[in-house]
Amino acid sequence: MSATNGPQPQDLNRIVLDYLAKKGYSRTEAMLRLEASGSGVSVEEKLKSIEETPDAYTHTYTILRDWVDSSLELYKAELHRILFPIFVHSYLNLLSQDHYEAAKQFYELFKDDHTDLHDFDVKNLKSLSLPSHVAEDRTAQQYRQNKYQLHFSRITFDLLLHFLFENVSNGGSIIIKLINQHIDIHIVPGRPTVLENAKVINEQEGITGQSFERGDAQLQPVKLQQMPMDKEMEKIVEMDLEEEDMMHQNDPNNQSPKLLKEFRKLHEPNAEDAPSRDYIPLPPHKGVDILSEVEAVKDWSKRLHLGPRASLPSVCMYTFHHTNNNMNCAEFSPDSTMIACGFQESYIRLWSIKADKKSLPKSTSVEDSDGSVRLLSHSGPVYGTTFSPDNKYLLSCSEDASARLWSVDTKTALVAYKGHTGPVWDVAFGPFGHYFATASHDQTAQLWSCDHIYPLRVFAGHLSDVDCVTFHPNSAYVLTGSSDKTCRLWDVHRGHSVRVFNGHTQPVTAVAIAPDGHTMASADSEGLIHLWDIGTGRRIKTMRGHRGNIYSLSFSRESTVLVSGGSDCTVRAWDVFKTNYNNPVSSSLTGSVVTPFSAKTSTFNEVNWSTSPDQMVALYTKQTPIFNVSFTRRNLCLAISVS
């Protein structure tokens, strides 16, 4: 009789659960587990039986946090990631239900759990106090309109489910609702992941737009090699370089390598990983382009060799005094003969840094007593400036929602480009000078050409202000950094995002792409620098040492050294290829530190911080923040500080 009995309900549940797990149906599996653990009581009945009182959120979060903290170390790192989105949406739910006092108490009790990784968002949420604030605030709507992405191993996910099912009547139902509405958990194969640095979030965690867009973006192929040179131009350049080699072949004082040989090294054909010549339309080459290429090869042959096995970078610092906090930006010209600065009073000042001071011809513009020239046209503070590669033109961007093109020779405004609907924070010329890009408060970046007054491409996808922008060396891509704490790489030809770099916990303040085109660096307002592999979209390492906003990044010509400057009054050099697997050590024991007396006695130097092992040197100023760092074509580092 017993042999003819069918399988028991427990066996059926186990068989179905195993099948669902193999097929990856995690949501269906979760619901079945809930049903199976209910002893005849349905999931809906259990969830409805829990009243979401103001005190229930505090109780629920407390039991979840206590359980996570008591978990095994192997699983604790992954489980901790669930706490922040639960904290955010519990707080927003309380505000939406008009329980301000309970929300305030909840915030004060648990905010310290998340200030290390999410300080920026935690501080923004503090200003909310009414249901209407939740509906209108940008940060709140980012979390309400986009699901928070988490990646758990199978074991970690099962542990979380088991805990929630056991505590359905003790607050687990509230967490289940929050996860279902606002969190997207992806199951990944393998063991639980453990981050080596607790102050860096997982690059796949958080909100970066729609999850399918991010996944597709990381899989799209990219062409990162240098764009091939025009064949006719290449022949002319080779002829000129060959003549130069012939002129100096008998000169005993000439120790530079053969220019033609260096040129061919720089332009080795690599059709597989390079965009085609017609991928990005460019105007015909001019005589000045040939001269510029010849000079670039000469500078390359005379460059300083930098790196841990060669020499540390030399830094030439220009300090601007008595700016009264009115200077917003500063930029060197590509030939290192001029500096352009933007000011709060809506003008630009142009300086010559050549010894003879002849690089600024007389013009009708306003000339100051210090020899600088004022450029007047904007109607709001100027936030960004950039020179064209041939040093003939200057671009600026302003709060007046426009970018303007200036002639360096005549010191006059030539064109106003109006396409943004908010202040323009940054502007960058492309490597060939024909195209430029702008970054704006309206959450977009735009691509322009100098001969059109309307944008050619609008790069939309960031969830907050686009704060910084730069071009890839082959001009086929534009890189942006945003206050949404992500960076994006955009295809200029198609106008789509092809890479999303997620991992910062603060707004991105500076970005740079290495001359080799395969590596990029991004920095944030907390002082962290992330190094990324553009091809795979994955983070290589995190560099720590700065203690505040980082304003500027620049790679050496060989892409082996990165320099950074920021509000902590230091210029720091980093070894790009050194790994950071070892534990961080005290900054006084890492690399070289050059510190003046005034910096040693300043208050912010008393703060205890750690520096990653790849820092090569830290150079301190006399309490003047660094606005710009830039390598010349000969690998001399130029920097600008402001008092």
Swiss-Prot record:
GO terms for cellular component: cytosol; nucleus; SAGA complex; transcription factor TFIID complex. Functions as a component of both the DNA-binding general transcription initiation factor complex TFIID and the transcription coactivator SAGA complex. Binding of TFIID to a promoter (with or without TATA element) is the initial step in pre-initiation complex (PIC) formation. The keyword Nucleus applies. GO terms for biological process: positive regulation of DNA-templated transcription; transcription initiation at RNA polymerase II promoter; transcription initiation-coupled chromatin remodeling. It is found in: Nucleus. Component of the 1.8 MDa SAGA (Spt-Ada-Gcn5 acetyltransferase) complex, which is composed of 19 subunits tra1, spt7, taf5, ngg1/ada3, sgf73, spt20, spt8, taf12, taf6, hfi1/ada1, ubp8, gcn5, ada2, spt3, sgf29, taf10, taf9, sgf11 and sus1. InterPro entries: G-protein_beta_WD-40_rep, LisH, TFIID_NTD2, TFIID_NTD2_sf, WD40/YVTN_repeat-like_dom_sf, WD40_repeat_CS, WD40_repeat_dom_sf, WD40_rpt. The C-terminal WD40 motifs are required for its incorporation into TFIID and function in SAGA. Belongs to the WD repeat TAF5 family. Its main location: nucleus. Residues 8-40 form the LisH domain. The modification Phosphoserine is found at S256. Keywords: Nucleus, Phosphoprotein, Repeat, Transcription, Transcription regulation, WD repeat. The keyword Glycoprotein does not apply. One of its GO terms (molecular function) is RNA polymerase II general transcription initiation factor activity. This is SAGA complex/transcription factor TFIID complex subunit Taf5. WD repeats lie at residues 322-361, 377-416, 419-458, 461-500, 503-542, 545-584.
